[in-house]
Amino acid sequence: GSQIWLEPGEQLTLDEMLKAICISSANDAAVAVAEFIGGSEPVFVERMNARAKELGMQSTTFRNACGLDEDGHLSTARDVAIMSREMLLNHPEIENYCTVWMDTLRGGATQLVNTNKLLKSYNGITGLKTGTTGKAGVCISASASRDDLRLIAVVLGSSSGKERFAAATSLLDYGFAMFESALVPIPADAPKTLPVQKGEEPALELCYTAPERCLAVKGQGSTLQAEVELPQTLEAPIREGSVIGSLNIKNSQGILQSCPIIAAKPVDVRSFSGCFRRVVNALWLTA
């Protein structure tokens, strides 16, 4: 596999290691970073698998930190897309590495060249990573952004780099031709709170988890509607983060996406002292 030929005891910054990994697929750099963070590669791989499970990567099992063929080291296009989405959404600095065409290390002695040719040919490309092994074939997770629409195209098992890039280009072209990014039309009168029975607080503050924008068929974004589903009242206790209802994003054919509405804060069951205080306050107000 690709490497930068790290020497025992050699020191590089994490920034330099990430350049080597993201630009030129340096497997030795990936293992070195795994050992630095996890203490050993196997421990780091355990963390990789735990994180994959958290993200919902149901068909992925990592056996090493660099992606080379190994018994039981498996993934799918769907899972690679989930992982890519997580990187782009919550670690956007990755684009600073994956969009670099050429760079150097060791004072210019080591040249890094990106194998993602879409960086030079595709409008709006933002990364992400190529990869090739004997079992997986020639692969890519390609990401691109145009007019607030961000897409990820994952291609596995190609027979050549040319086939890989052609397939990724076709997928991205299809996505940009058929879909658009639309504002989620949250109703202006959507409830901010709900009354709570038997609670220390009379009302629960609601948190809407709906994204600012969502995917829509091109030309239909302005026709989207949002419908709020909530109970009339709640009963304590209520834990912070509990799902209270949903905001359903709809088009003419039905629900496109259902986004949870959750409790922004906990509400405990009203204590005796709380009940007594409310009675006293009520009597004071009516006196």
Each predicted region: which residue ranges?
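Domain-terminus/edge residues, biased toward the C-terminal soluble/receptor-binding domains
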Residues: M57-Q58, D69-L74, R78-A287
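Active-site-adjacent loops and short helices of periplasmic peptidoglycan-processing enzymes
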Residues: G1-H91
